[in-house]
Amino acid sequence: MEIQIERLTTTEAAVAAGVSVPQINRIIDEKILPEDLYSTSPTRTFRTDAALLIAFYFETADSLTTNARLEAIRNAKMRCSSWSEWKDCTVGDQYLTIRFSDLWKEVDQRLRRLSEARAMVVEDPEILSGTPVIRGTRIPVHDVAAQVEAEVPIEEILEMYPRLSAAQVALASIYAAAVPQRGRPRRLSIPGATVVSMTKKRLRSSSQGA
């Protein structure tokens, strides 16, 4: 299935490329990519295929010079345009050949997972005043992702949310990374629980601050 070229926010681009948000911002601040791959107005957004070149730029930092990476990006951009073309895109000369196929598969998989995560979440004014929830439930997606971030074992998370599957929990984590919670974080609401055991990491933080 062809992935449609669309716009990604900085956080979505970070998820798709497998890099950090500061690295994503560097791409624009340092004008690393051709300008038609991103926009800065009204907000910073990227074309979907930019995620592949962002991943390439950072993943090859230890093996290629900055100039070599920039030249490869320019040459690849001239040869490949559609997402399917990027799969077999190859650039180089008699001294160096760069094939994007393996990296394309990784980015393509992340993009598909991101699409699945988006499709799993709904925002309905009639459900928790529009709080993003997992489709078919009233479970806030960011609450589930917070448990993953806190390193709560998946078995415990599934006990807290018996209506969810392990796959949905994984997608919740992806969604939260791509679409961070707006405003002040909500207090976690865990079904059927009045006391929540804290992770070792949280316990350590509490003891240090006592």
Predicted regions and their residues:
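Pre-recognition alpha-helix immediately N-terminal to the DNA-recognition helix
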Residues: 23, 52-53, 140-143
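The alpha-helix within a helix-turn-helix
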Residues: 14, 158-159
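Polyanion-binding surface elements
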Residues: 2-23
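Short helix-start
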Residues: 34-60
